Regions:
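Conserved active-site tyrosine of GNAT-family acetyltransferases
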Residues: 29, 33-34, 101, 126-129
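Short glycine-/small-residue motifs
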Residues: 131-134
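Conserved beta-strand-loop-alpha-helix junction that forms the acyl-donor binding cleft
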Residues: 23-26, 116
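Vicinal oxygen chelate
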Residues: 2-18, 40-91, 95-125, 136-139
Length: 139
């Protein structure tokens, strides 16, 4: 892209996204994401704590405490409303990740399956009802 005086103007490049998950208890959520899903706590903020972030590799999930339900009833599970979507690079990795979460006793909304478009996916249900999609590429 060029500007009037022949200057080149760089277009901003979006490099990542961070999902914000609504939770009831920041400590319980951090414990779930670290103990069950292999994330680490990047930070917890507030007194009492109401905001935090967990990370694993290049994935970041923000956790925000809310005092009342954000969604009505079981609409998230009924309508399969995802709170976050995380990807891995290979079919071997998605299978390995699924098996490690299964061994850790993680509750699944959907077990590992091949989607009609070829991707391999599974969905984890966290203690607050957030649906976290994990996806790998087609074969």
């Amino acid at each position: 892209m060029t500007h009037e005086a022949g200057q080149t103007v760089l277009c901003p490049v979006l490099s990542s996204t961070e999902a914000q998950l609504f939770v009831a208890d920041i400590k319980a959520s951090c414990d779930f994401y670290t103990d069950k899903l292999g994330f680490t706590v990047a930070f917890v903020y507030g007194d009492p704590p109401y905001y935090g972030q967990v990370t694993r590799d290049h994935a970041r999930l923000n956790l925000r405490v809310v005092g009342e339900p954000v969604f009505v009833g079981d609409i998230r599970e009924r309508e399969h409303l995802l709170s976050a979507s995380l990807t891995v690079a290979s079919t071997d990795e998605i299978k390995q990740l699924f098996l490690s979460y299964q061994a850790a006793g993680v509750r699944f909304h959907q077990t590992l399956k091949k989607e009609p478009w070829g991707a391999r996916t599974f969905i984890v249900l966290d203690p607050d009802g957030n649906l976290i999609l994990f996806a790998g590429p087609a074969d």
